[in-house]
From Swiss-Prot:
Residues 458-490, 977-1060 are annotated as: Disordered. It is found in: Nucleus; Chromosome. SUPFAM superfamilies: Creatinase/aminopeptidase. The keyword GTP-binding does not apply. One of its GO terms (biological process) is nucleosome assembly. Residues 979-990, 997-1044 have a biased composition (Acidic residues). It comes from Candida albicans (strain SC5314 / ATCC MYA-2876) (Yeast). This is FACT complex subunit SPT16. Residues 508-532 form a coiled coil. InterPro entries: Creatin/AminoP/Spt16_N (IPR029149), Creatinase/aminopeptidase-like (IPR036005), FACT-SPT16_Nlobe (IPR029148), Fact-SPT16_PH (IPR056595), FACT_SPT16_M (IPR013953), Pept_M24 (IPR000994), PH-like_dom_sf (IPR011993), RTT106/SPT16-like_middle_dom (IPR013719). GO terms for molecular function: histone binding; histone chaperone activity; nucleosome binding.
Length: 1060
C-alpha cells in the first residue's frame, strides 16, 4: 500500500453522509469489521463501505462510527495512510494502533467494547458479512466473553444487541455525486465497447461456422481486457474511451465473468454462467457484460437474433416497447421500487397476457460499488425503498422459456435439423444502465438494440424474402405527413417547371428550408445538452460561497535564533536574501519578518527625517476575502498581529536603499510563486524506448517550435518505440551545447496534425499534448515540427539561360519549380505523419485541416485563419496556437450578431466548466451562416445574442450550483438579451466604497503585486491546451497593432500604388 493516497475532504464529506443516515435510521453506533480478504465474494457491504469512505480496502481493520466520532483500529503499517485524517480533525477521527503485543491488542478491543456499551446497547453491523482471520477471532473472543459475563448476571442491561446495517449502507451509497457518476459513465462506455467487440467476434464465428463453446468465447472476451489497448481496435472505443482525458485502462475490471448463452439453454439470473455447450449460430444468442471503473459497476445485455422467425421478432419488439414504457413512466424520482415491478406486470397483462408467466422475477436493481444491492431490488417484495435522483439502476427485463412451435409449422422445409430443434425454446433479455433524475431517466449504456441492428440473416433466400416483406410492410406504416413530404420531394425533383419566376426566389426558398432544418437540429442538440447536464451533476455538486476558507501559506524564516545573521547586532534594518526575510530592530532586538508577511510600504520625507512605513498582512486588514488568494496567517484568537510599523531615520540614502531592497525581494518572491503555479501541471514523461539502426524512421532538416534555445537550429525528427525524438544538429563538432533533445511520447499526444504548405510559407507536423512539457525554460502544450516551403529566388538577368527565354518565362519556370517543391514537401511530411500514426499502434490519429472551411478571426491579438479539422478547430501557422477540441465543447455562443455590424464574435464554452472560455473575435459577418452550418454539422449547440456577455460571472454562477443551473433550463438563457460589458462594469464600479480605516498607502503597491500575482480565471487562453498555447509562445510573436493604425497603413499603401 505504498501508493495509497486518501482524499481527506472526500472522506469527511462521505462520513458525514453516513452519520446522517445512521441518525435517520435510529442507529446510535455502527461497527464495520473486515478480516482477511476473500475472493469468493468481492461485493461484501463492509468492504464496499470501506472503499466508499477511503477509496481502498483495509483488511484486518475495524471502523467504529457514531454521530460525532469515527475510530479506526488497525495495524501500524496501515495507520500511516490514515494519520492525516486525525491531524486535520482530531475531535472527529481517532486512530487506535495495533501492535505485535497480544495484551495491548486485547485491551484495545476491551476499550472499544466499553465505549459501545456506555453509549447504547444497540449497535449496527452487516449481519450477512462473514470474515475469517486472527483479527476477527480476537474480537469474537472478547465479545463472547462479555456475553457470557452478562448471562451470568441477573441484570443484563449492558448486553449488546446487533441490528442489520445493510439498508443504512445502501441508503448512504445510493445517490451518486458527480465524481461517482463520471466513473460509472466511463464504466458504461467500456461495457458498450466490449459488447461491440463481442458482436464483431460473434459475427465472424457464426458466419465462418467456427466450432467454439460458449465458455471458450467467454474466456476470449474476458482476456481482452488484459491488453490495455484493447479498446483502440474499434472506432467506438476510440470515440467513447480514448477521447476521455483522464481515462486509465488500469482501473478497468469485470464486475462478473461475461455470460454468453445459445442453443436453447438460457438462464436470465445475474448469477448465470456460460456453459460448455457449443455456440449455436441460429435462433437466439444472449450476451451480458459488466465492467467497473474505479470500483463503480455498469451492466449491459443484448439479445441477438440469428435467422429469426416472425414470432421472435414480434416478441422482441414488445420487449423494446416494454423497456421504453418503464423508462418513460416508471423510472422517476419518488417512485417505489415495488410499484415499478407491479406496473410493469400490469402493462404486460394488458398488452401481451401470454407473456406474463415468462417475465423475469424482477426489473433490475440498484447499481454502484456493489454490483447488485440485495436491499434494493425492483420486485414486489421491496416495499420500503423509493427511486431517488442520482441513483444508478441496472434495468434488466426479459422473457424466458418461450416456445417457437407455431412458426416452425409454417416453415416451408418440414425436415427439422438439430439446429431447428434448438430453436424450439428461446429467451429474450435486455439490460441497460440508467441514471434516475427528476424528470426523464438518462441512458448510460447507449448501444444499438433496435431489431434491425441485432438481427442477422445468414440465409440468402430468406434474407431476400424478408427484405421484400419489410419493404411491403413499411409502406403502409408511413404517416400521412411522411407520404405528403415524399410526394412533394418527388414532384420537385422530377419537374423542370419552376414555381417562381425569378432564380433568387428559389435560392431564398432553399435557404429557408436549410435554416428550418438547422433549427430543428439545434433544438435536439440543446435538449441533448440539457439531459447530459442533468446526468452529469447532482445536488451534491453545489458549492456555497460561505463555505470558502482562505488557504494559508506555510513558511518559516529561522528555526533557531542562532540562524539569524551576526550582522544584525548593529540594530539596523537588514534584508536576508537567502531566507527571504526582513529583520527589523524593535526594542533593541532583531525581529524577523518573512517576505510573505509583507504587504506594502511607502517612503516619504518630513524635515530632516525620512519615514519608512511597512504594512503587513493580517486577517481582515482591508483585503478582499472573496478572492481565493493565499493568506500568510491563520486567524485565531490566540494570535496577535502587527499590522504596520513606521521607522524614522536621518540617513535618507540608507532608507532609500532599504526600501528598494524590500521591494525587489517582494517582487522576486511573487515571481517565484507565480512560476511555481504555472509549472504545477507540468509532468515528467516516462523514458523514451529507443530503436537502433535502420529501424528508426527519420525526417531530416526540420525546425521545432518553441525552440529549446534562443537560436534557430535545424534538426532531425525520429520515430521510436513509444514516442518521437527531435534532436538538433550542432553547427560544429565541438559545440555540444546546441545538441538539444525534445522527447514526446505517444501516450501524451492528444491530437496530431499535418498541415500542407498550400497558400502557406511552411509545411508542418503539429503535436497537441494532453499534459504540458518543458522545452528549454518554457511550458508548452504544443510542439511543432516544420520546414520552410520556399527558398530565396535569384534573378539570373546576366545568366546564359536568359537569352533562351523570352517575356516572363523565367518567372513562370520559378513558379512551376516552387509548386513542384511544395508538392514534394507535402508528400514527404504527410507520409512521415502517417508513419507516426501507424507507429503509435492506434494511440494517435492523424488529422488534416480543411482550409476551404476556414474563417478569419482574432483568437488572441491578431487576425488569423482558423481552420476546422475532423476533431478540432485550429490555427497552427502563427504562435500562439489555437487548438479547440470539438468533443469538449458544451456550447458555442455568437456575440454581437445584429444588423449594421460588419463582424461578430464566437465564444466556446467547455464541458469542464473550470476551463476558461475561448473567444474568437472579429469574424466577418458574411461568414455567419457558414460558421453556423459548420457548428451544426459537428453537433455543437449554438446560441446568439446582440451583446458581449460577462463570461467570468456566468461561469461562476454555473459552477456555484451546476445541477440547479440545468434544472432552470441550462443554456436557454443565452437566446435572450445579454447584459453588455459596459453594464457589468458600471455595476462593479457602483459597489466601490472608500475606506477610512486603513491608510492610503497601504494598498497602493499591494495592488501592483496582486496584478502580477493574480489573473482572471477566465480571461486567458485554455491552460490544458484546448484553447491553444496561450502565453507559452508569446516571445515568438510580435504584439499586434490596433485597427486604426492598420487602416491608416492600408490607405497609405493604396495611395502609393496608384489606386483611388
Amino acid at each position: 500500500m505504498s501508493e495509497v493516497n486518501i482524499d481527506a475532504g472526500l472522506f469527511y464529506k462521505r462520513l458525514s453522509i453516513f452519520q446522517k443516515q445512521l441518525t435517520a435510521n435510529n442507529i446510535p453506533q455502527a461497527l464495520i469489521i473486515v478480516g482477511a480478504r476473500s475472493d469468493d465474494n468481492t461485493y461484501k457491504k463492509s468492504t464496499v463501505l470501506q472503499n466508499w469512505l477511503l477509496g481502498y480496502e483495509f483488511i484486518h481493520t475495524a471502523i467504529y462510527i457514531t454521530d460525532k466520532k469515527c475510530i479506526f483500529i488497525t495495524s501500524e503499517g496501515k495507520s500511516k495512510h490514515l494519520k492525516h485524517l486525525t491531524n486535520q480533525k482530531p475531535d472527529l477521527v481517532e486512530l487506535w494502533i495495533r501492535t505485535k503485543d497480544v495484551e495491548h491488542n486485547k485491551q484495545l478491543f476491551i476499550k472499544l467494547l466499553e465505549t459501545m456499551t456506555k453509549l447504547d446497547s444497540k449497535y449496527g453491523k452487516i449481519l450477512k458479512d462473514k470474515y475469517d482471520g486472527k483479527f476477527i477471532d480476537e474480537w469474537n473472543q472478547i465479545l463472547n466473553d462479555d456475553n457470557n459475563n452478562n448471562n451470568n448476571n441477573t441484570t443484563n442491561d449492558h448486553a449488546l444487541s446487533a441490528v442489520d446495517l445493510a439498508v443504512t449502507v445502501s441508503q448512504a451509497l445510493a445517490v451518486k455525486d458527480s465524481e461517482e457518476f463520471n466513473n460509472t459513465k466511463i464504466a458504461s462506455n467500456a461495457s458498450v465497447v466490449m459488447m461491440d467487440t463481442f458482436v464483431n467476434d460473434m459475427m465472424i464465428i457464426v458466419d465462418d461456422e467456427k466450432k467454439i463453446t460458449n465458455s471458450q468465447l467467454t474466456d476470449q472476451i474476458e482476456d481482452k481486457i488484459e491488453n490495455n489497448k484493447w479498446y483502440l481496435k474499434t472506432k467506438l472505443g476510440k470515440n467513447l474511451l480514448q477521447s476521455i482525458k483522464d481515462f486509465d485502462p488500469e482501473y478497468l475490471e469485470y464486475c462478473y465473468s461475461p455470460i454468453i448463452q445459445s442453443g436453447g439453454d438460457y438462464d436470465l439470473k445475474p448469477s448465470a454462467v456460460s456453459t460448455d455447450k457449443p455456440l449455436i449460430g441460429e435462433g437466439v444468442i444472449l450476451s451480458s457484460i459488466g465492467l467497473r471503473y474505479k470500483s463503480y459497476c455498469s451492466n449491459i445485455a443484448r439479445t441477438f437474433l440469428i435467422d429469426p422467425t416472425s414470432e421472435m421478432e414480434t416478441n422482441y419488439d414488445f420487449l423494446l416497447q416494454l423497456q421504453k414504457y418503464i423508462v418513460d413512466n416508471l423510472l422517476k424520482d419518488g417512485v417505489p421500487a415495488n410499484k415499478v415491478y407491479q406496473d410493469t406486470i400490469d402493462y404486460i397483462k394488458k398488452e401481451r397476457p401470454d407473456l406474463v408467466n415468462h417475465f423475469t422475477k424482477n426489473c433490475g436493481w440498484l447499481l454502484g460499488m456493489e454490483f447488485r444491492d440485495s436491499t434494493f431490488i425492483l420486485n414486489a417484495k421491496t416495499t420500503d425503498r423509493k427511486l431517488t435522483t442520482g441513483q444508478i439502476i441496472s434495468l434488466t427485463i426479459g422473457f424466458n422459456n418461450l416456445s417457437n412451435d407455431k412458426n416452425d409449422k409454417n416453415d416451408k422445409n418440414d425436415n427439422k435439423t438439430n439446429h431447428q430443434k434448438n430453436k424450439q425454446t428461446y429467451a429474450l433479455l435486455l439490460t441497460d444502465t440508467i441514471k434516475i433524475t427528476d424528470d426523464s431517466s438518462i441512458l448510460l449504456t447507449n448501444y444499438s438494440k433496435d431489431r434491425a441492428a441485432i438481427s442477422f440473416s445468414f440465409n440468402d433466400d430468406n434474407e431476400t424474402q424478408k427484405e421484400n416483406n419489410n419493404n411491403n410492410n413499411k409502406r403502409p406504416g408511413l404517416s400521412q405527413t411522411s407520404n405528403t413530404t415524399a410526394l412533394k420531394l418527388e414532384s420537385t425533383e422530377n419537374t423542370a417547371i419552376l414555381k417562381s419566376k425569378l432564380r433568387h426566389e428559389n435560392t431564398n426558398a432553399d435557404d429557408a428550408n436549410s435554416e428550418k432544418l438547422r433549427q430543428e437540429i439545434q433544438i435536439k442538440l440543446h435538449e441533448k445538452r440539457l439531459q447530459e447536464g442533468l446526468a452529469r451533476f447532482s445536488k451534491a455538486d453545489a458549492t456555497d460561497a460561505d463555505d470558502f476558507k482562505p488557504i494559508f501559506k506555510k513558511y518559516e524564516s529561522y528555526v533557531r535564533e542562532s540562524q539569524i545573521p551576526n550582522s544584525v547586532n548593529d540594530l539596523k534594518i537588514h534584508i536576508d536574501y537567502k531566507n527571504q526575510t526582513i529583520i527589523l530592530p524593535i526594542s533593541g532586538r532583531p525581529v524577523p519578518f518573512h517576505i510573505n508577511s509583507y504587504k506594502s510600504g511607502s517612503q516619504n520625507e518630513e524635515g530632516d527625517f525620512t519615514y519608512l512605513r511597512l504594512n503587513f498582512n493580517s486577517p481582515g486588514a482591508g483585503g478582499n476575502v472573496t478572492k481565493k488568494q493565499e493568506l500568510p496567517y491563520e486567524d485565531s484568537p490566540d494570535n496577535s498581529f502587527l499590522r504596520s510599523i513606521t521607522i524614522r531615520s536621518r540617513d535618507r540614502q540608507r532608507m532609500v536603499d532599504v526600501y528598494k531592497a524590500i521591494q525587489d525581494l517582494k517582487k522576486d518572491s511573487v515571481k517565484r510563486e507565480q512560476e511555481k503555479k504555472q509549472m504545477a501541471d507540468v509532468i515528467t514523461q516516462a523514458n523514451l524506448i529507443e530503436l537502433k539502426g535502420s529501424r528508426v524512421k527519420k525526417l531530416n532538416n526540420v525546425f521545432i517550435r518553441p525552440t529549446p534555445d534562443t537560436k534557430k537550429i535545424g534538426g532531425v525528427l525520429q520515430i521510436h518505440e513509444n514516442g518521437l525524438r527531435y534532436q538538433s544538429q550542432p553547427q560544429s563538432q565541438s559545440n555540444f551545447k546546441n545538441d538539444q533533445r525534445v522527447d514526446v511520447l505517444f501516450s501524451n499526444i492528444k491530437h496530431l496534425f499535418f498541415q500542407p504548405c498550400k497558400d502557406e510559407l511552411i509545411v508542418l507536423i503539429h503535436c497537441h499534448l494532453k499534459n504540458p512539457i518543458m522545452i528549454g525554460k518554457r511550458k508548452t502544450f504544443d510542439v511543432q515540427f516544420y520546414r520552410e516551403a520556399s527558398d530565396m529566388a535569384f534573378d539570373e538577368t546576366g545568366g546564359r539561360k536568359r537569352k533562351y527565354r523570352y517575356g516572363d518565362e523565367d518567372e513562370l519556370q520559378q513558379e512551376q519549380e516552387e509548386r513542384r517543391r511544395k508538392a514534394l514537401l507535402d508528400k514527404e511530411f504527410k507520409g512521415f505523419a502517417e508513419l507516426i500514426a501507424d507507429s503509435s499502434h492506434g494511440m494517435v490519429d492523424l488529422d488534416i485541416p480543411f482550409r476551404e472551411l476556414g474563417f478569419q478571426g482574432v483568437p488572441f491579438r491578431s487576425s488569423v485563419l482558423c481552420v476546422p479539422t475532423r476533431d478540432c478547430l485550429v490555427q497552427l501557422i502563427d504562435p500562439p496556437y489555437l487548438v479547440v477540441t470539438l468533443e469538449e465543447i458544451e456550447i458555442a455562443h455568437l456575440e454581437r450578431v445584429q444588423f449594421g455590424l460588419k463582424n461578430f464574435d464566437l465564444v466556446f464554452v467547455f464541458k469542464d466548466f473550470n476551463k476558461p472560455v475561448v473567444h474568437i473575435n472579429t469574424i466577418p459577418v458574411e461568414l455567419l451562416e457558414d460558421v453556423k452550418s459548420w457548428l451544426t454539422d459537428v453537433d455543437i449547440p449554438i446560441s446568439e445574442g446582440q451583446m458581449n456577455l460577462n463570461w467570468v460571472q456566468i461561469m461562476k454562477t454555473v459552477l456555484a450550483d451546476p445541477y440547479q443551473f440545468f434544472i432552470d433550463g441550462g443554456w436557454a438563457f443565452l437566446t435572450g438579451q445579454g447584459e453588455s460589458d459596459e453594464e457589468e462594469e458600471s455595476d462593479e464600479e457602483s459597489d466601490f466604497r472608500v475606506s477610512d480605516e486603513d491608510p492610503q498607502d497601504e494598498d497602493e503597491e499591494s495592488d501592483d503585486y496582486a496584478s502580477e500575482e493574480e489573473s482572471d480565471d477566465y480571461s486567458g487562453s485554455d491552460d490544458d491546451g484546448s484553447g491553444g498555447g496561450g502565453d507559452d509562445d508569446d516571445d515568438d510573436s510580435e504584439s499586434g497593432e490596433d485597427w486604426d493604425a492598420l487602416e491608416r497603413k492600408a490607405a497609405k499603401a493604396d495611395r502609393n500604388s496608384g489606386f483611388d
